Amino acid sequence: ESMLHMRNGRSSKAHIYRLPYAVEVYKNGLVSKIIVSGGRNIGNANMVEADYLKEKAIEFGIKKKDILVENKAMTTWENMKLSRELMIKNNLLGECTNIAIVTSSFHMRRSIMIAERVFRDDGVNIVSLPGEDNSTRRTTWFTNEKGRVRAIGEVEKIIDYVKKGKIDDFEII
């Protein structure tokens, strides 16, 4: 059994870039459940990220019963911790052997490292499935200001998470 964890981040554009990819993965039978995660308010939708993503996922054809909603998290760390608690509450963690993370490439390393820490004792494989936008693709992030700013911000967050002991230190090669 596989679970897909999709987090929105700070933008309501996740339904444009990440959600279609998550839907494709689901419809191809690679995952049986989707967790949408995020508690930040989306002004244009007048709701929090996860609730908005759930509505969009249903519009895209995901069965309501296959969507779990984590709508309290304000950080990536909280996304993972609260999603794990949601899986435990719904008796899914023991059944699940793979957790696929859908987020952008620039955010993937930290997301995977946090997921590996949070799910460390649960016997699951963490898989990355980057859902891309145009400014932060692995091959283009450095060609535009938005991509460079996001990449630098992500490095700063990784350093902060290492200092706080939330992820393990590692060598950049």
Each PLM stretch: what is its role?
Residues 135-173:
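C-terminal capping/extension of enzyme domains
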Residues 1-151:
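A structural signal for short, hydrophobic/glycine-enriched beta-strand patches
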